[in-house]
């Protein structure tokens, strides 16, 4: 019994809030199209989500993503990765932008580090129909 208690306590201590983190549902509006997604329970994601509703003028790039500058600079932007998964919503500290990645390409490696803050859970095919520049709004359902 002591071993079981120790194993549970040990797991909780090292797992912490990360293992039990909850995602928050987010609405992503592109013109008349409404998509669903989630925002992760991280310091950076929550810092950005505190600014919702947030409209970002985004540009399509490389047949794989939309990205655009945000009007504030988050403080919790440490780390990052040079790859993405389809559906990732990311923040890039290098150029202070949000991005939505929707399609792997023949060049899946990135030149700037991005930090995932959420993901689109709707069908990503919608992004292939959008124009070269779109106003994308992130908000929470009321």
Task: Show the residue positions of the predicted features.
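N-terminal secretory signal peptides
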Residues: 23-69
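Envelope-exposed proteins and targeting segments
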Residues: 24, 33, 96-98, 132-134
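Well-ordered alpha/beta subsegment
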Residues: 27, 112-142
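Beta-strand-rich cores of mature extracytoplasmic or soluble domains
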Residues: 93-120
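Boundary at the C-terminal end of the N-terminal hydrophobic targeting segment
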Residues: 19-21
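Bacterial N-terminal signal peptides
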Residues: 7-16
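Mature extracytoplasmic domains of secretory-pathway proteins
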Residues: 51-96
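Positively charged n-region of N-terminal signal peptides that target proteins for export
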Residues: 1-4
């Amino acid at each position: 019994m002591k071993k079981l208690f120790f194993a549970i306590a040990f797991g909780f201590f090292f797992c912490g809030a990360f293992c039990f983190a909850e995602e928050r549902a987010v609405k992503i509006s592109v013109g008349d199209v409404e998509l669903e997604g989630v925002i992760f329970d991280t310091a950076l994601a929550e810092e950005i989500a505190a600014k919702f509703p947030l409209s970002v003028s985004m540009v399509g790039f490389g047949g794989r993503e939309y990205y655009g500058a945000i009007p504030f600079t988050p403080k919790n932007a440490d780390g990052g990765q040079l790859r993405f998964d389809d559906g990732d919503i990311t923040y890039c500290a290098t150029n202070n932008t949000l991005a939505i990645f929707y399609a792997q390409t023949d060049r899946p490696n990135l030149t700037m580090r991005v930090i995932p803050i959420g993901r689109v859970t709707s069908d990503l095919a919608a992004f292939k129909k959008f124009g070269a520049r779109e106003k994308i709004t992130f908000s929470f359902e009321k």
